[in-house]
Amino acid sequence: MNFETIAAQAAHQIDPATGAVAPPIYLSTTFERDADGEYSRGFVYSRVDNPNRHALEECLALLEGGETGNAASAAFASGSAATAAVFQALAPGDHVIAPDDCYHGTSRMLREVFAPWGVETSFVDMTDADAVQRSVRPNTRLVWVETPSNPLLKITDIARMAAIAHSAGAACACDNTWASPMLQRPFESDADLVVHSTTKYLSGHEDVTGGAVVGREDSPFFQRVRLIQNLCGAVPSPFDCWLTLRGIRTLPVRMRAHSANAGQLARFLEDHSQVSAVHYPGLPDHPGHDIAARQMSDFGGMLSFQVAGGREAAMAVAAGVKLFVRATSLGGTQSLIEHRASIEGPDTTTPDDLLRVSVGLENADDLIGDLAQALG
């Protein structure tokens, strides 16, 4: 079955009681036992499972893993909760290799939460496979990949990272938030786990927070993540699951529009005299263009650019836009712009002349016109 059909119909059932086409929202926290004490209908308590979460998890597994029947997913209350569950599956003394430019929330989590728990991390430039290989230790248990990266849109060869991880007896996890399964499916490059902030492209409407981990059903690592989901309880509400699944139904058409708009903006910015650099893998001169073209079906809706004149000039551009919204996050219908270094704080390595853009679903000509007047 093609991806568009999976997105539109996976885990969809006509309500047997009413014939309703849209799924109901099951707000119940608890479910009735049979007379013999069994739960023949499959649900016990909504922290453990819920019909809305079950449908969302089934759909996510199909989106990332296809119809092989071997993929499963665990939904969480946020992308950070999903990420934390992967790291919680490790043990004190385990070693992680992570990108040196990974999402600042993930970097802080590893440094400030899991380092005191005894989890060691090496932050490495993952565009340099040899550097990653040199970072492997006897206690390496996880190679964490983010591609495209945030906010410089570096591209990592997922298959190469998975091979390095597996040769060391470690797992490879890929944060696929920026690409979405519409554009990139890390399992096809031998990743073991795929992580999402479903807040972003999957839900797609800036109105629900969530996360997910997708893995192989028979993987001990993934089963550990599932146990953490159950016992620690950072799960999404039934309504959050319902909203996310509703957003997924339009994911393919949205991602095509995001990608097309971003490509047009990137080409405009590349030719602008007030822009010193554009970071977008769809540009032929991007260092990771060839890898992105191989492992992605399109180049996505995120880009960043650096403004000639430094921090003050970049801040002035962000202040001068009229259509773009000055806000963090990404993947929604509205175009967002932010001065990323200000968000990440004093320890950031992000250039202070850089603006990150989440390109929305507006007309590309209108967006270009807005940036043109803001750049001057």
Q: Where in this protein do the model-derived segments appear?
A:
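N-terminal glycine-rich, Lys/His-bearing helix-loop that initiates the first secondary-structure elements
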Residues: 1-43, 50
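Positively charged, small/polar-rich N-terminal and surface patches that mediate targeting and assembly
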Residues: 2-4, 10, 51, 322, ...
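Conserved PLP-enzyme active-site core in the AAT-like
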Residues: 9, 69-274, 279
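Conserved N-terminal alpha-helix of the aminotransferase class I/II PLP-enzyme fold
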Residues: 30-84, 89, 105-112
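PLP-dependent enzyme catalytic core of the Aspartate aminotransferase-like
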Residues: 141, 254, 319, 335-376
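A common structural junction motif
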Residues: 232-233, 320-331, 374-376
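Short, well-ordered beta-strand elements within core beta-sheets of diverse protein domains
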Residues: 244-253, 300-308, 355-360
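Conserved small-domain helix->loop->beta segment predominantly found in fold-type I
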Residues: 263-322, 341-349
